[in-house]
Amino acid sequence: GKIVNGSKIILSTTKDNDNQMLYIMPPLDQNIKEGLYGKSGLMYKGNGGSYLNYYQIGTGKKHLFLNFSIHGFEDSYDKDGAELTYMANEFWKYLKDNMSEELIQEWTVYILPVSNPDGQYNGWTNQGPGRTTVYSWAPENEGIDMNRCFPVGWTKLNSSRNYTGEQPLQAYEAEALREFILTNVGNENFVIDVHGWLNETIGNNELGSFYRDEFGISNHIGTYGKGYFIQWARSIPNTKSMLLELPEVKSHNELMQKGYVNKFNTATMNLLKSY
């Protein structure tokens, strides 16, 4: 395809793979881009899998990263991480129609709608592959819990539900997520990792307050977790991070009836307007 002004080119290498990947995604318009930042474990295995995709809007020096479905299975029903991806895609549609020129100039927003696609699409349990990735470069290629495997506070965990491998970042998808964030840091950075369904916020209290207000969440935990994505993210200079645990739903219909999409959109827009 044609390389146009504003196209994004990403070169990446990953463990056990010497091939560089070149992604060229022409911008949809001057301020809106969609692209790829890596491959899932099953793609490295050569058995299906998915590219890791992102959406981007804005040109500002304040950067907001919204990550969804780091666990393809949460703990309500099979493949319920898909609800988080649905919310991500709906927020992307909303931003394209509602982000003001002022916010576009102040902010760059990155949305990662499904950072563990193998878990969501090919997994089978919330106690192992599904919650975790399906294929990693850990011993026996066992699936990794991406939200326990980041380098800051990393702890070796052996259960299938929370397996962290023999060292940090043995999930291909976690490596790619880390590199994507580091490649795209701004002057100020805000990282939000969206989960279900524990009805609480974790990490930065101020960031959490926007979502507690909209969702009626009463509980906040001020620590950042061992090996959590937000624990690593806050080690980046000038970065605030927060994990959002949405209140539980039992179906897509319930999520729709309770207005989760609108609540999330409102909370995030309030955040953008407040900083």
Predicted regions and their residues:
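Active-site-adjacent mobile loop/cap segments within catalytic or ligand-binding domains
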Residues: 15-16, 191, 200-214, 222-275
